[in-house]
Curated annotation (Swiss-Prot):
EC class (word): oxidoreductase
Protein name in the entry: L-lactate dehydrogenase
GO CC term, one of those recorded: cytoplasm
Chief location of this protein within or outside the cell: cytoplasm
Segments traversing the membrane: none
List of residues that carry Phosphotyrosine: Y225
Organism from which the protein derives: Clostridium botulinum (strain Okra / Type B1)
GO biological processes: glycolytic process; lactate metabolic process
EC number: 1.1.1.27
Amino acid sequence: MIKKRNTTKISVIGAGSVGATTAYALMLSGVATEIVLVDVNKAKTEGEAMDLSHGADFVKPVNILSGDYKDTEGSDIVVITAGAAQKVGETRLQLINKNINIFKSIIPEVVKYNKDAILLVVSNPVDVLSYVTYKLSGFPKERVIGSGTVLDTSRLKHEIGKRYKIDPRNVNTYIMGEHGDSEIATWSVTNIQNIKIDEYANKENLEYNDNFRKEVYENVKNAAYEVINRKGATFYAIALAVTRIVKAILGDEKTILPVSTLVENYYGIKDVYLGMPCIVGGSGIEKALSIDLNKTEASKLVKSAETLKNTLNNASGL
């Protein structure tokens, strides 16, 4: 449980596009009194910290530092964004061997100085690396969280909201499973302010059929690739997603977010990290919710879990 105190310290490991933008989003949110940036590129890390610090007059009081792992000591949350970036045409799972080796050097250092912190993994492939972090850290599963499908779920809400011309915040739904190509859309539980989506579409004379679901799902699944093809990387939306998770933890909100967590017995799925609706609060993941899926969705979720397990089993360096 995050202890209530006058200061809140968040460390961000990795000061690339995602890490630096996450630090910026955290700074704007006002949730932290201290943010520490750590990266192998010392000069860039110092530059990012300087640039952020120069905006201190425009936000709540916050101390932005660059440093090494010792400077992260006593962090409430350690956000891990370090790793090889996803290139054009490269899947998240193809990043695995590069990033496992990076994590084998990062996690022991993080744990050395932060025995009581919550670890929030963002680097891709996030589900696999969350599992790797869980194993390397020795932390309880509640305190090792992956950003999971929080961003994918936001993308799904955006797509539905755009097509139906409604506020995406009024769309209740989840993307579950891998944060990647095998993720699933939970159409069977999707609703618009507690009205089932098929009923809402019928009442409002809107499209909702197999073609609609396929188009929306493909747009969500391929969203990162489309952004990467155009600008080289995704970082704004994931930074906002990470900030949302951090706020839920620090505020002990007990809100439901589809983060990546260790699944132990859900439709026969065990010993793998997957994006699942979870109650997120001061102790991290307080409970994973076993929502009822239809047969097709459950089957796809099992396949998603198998994909991730096979990737772990085939990865080098584990």
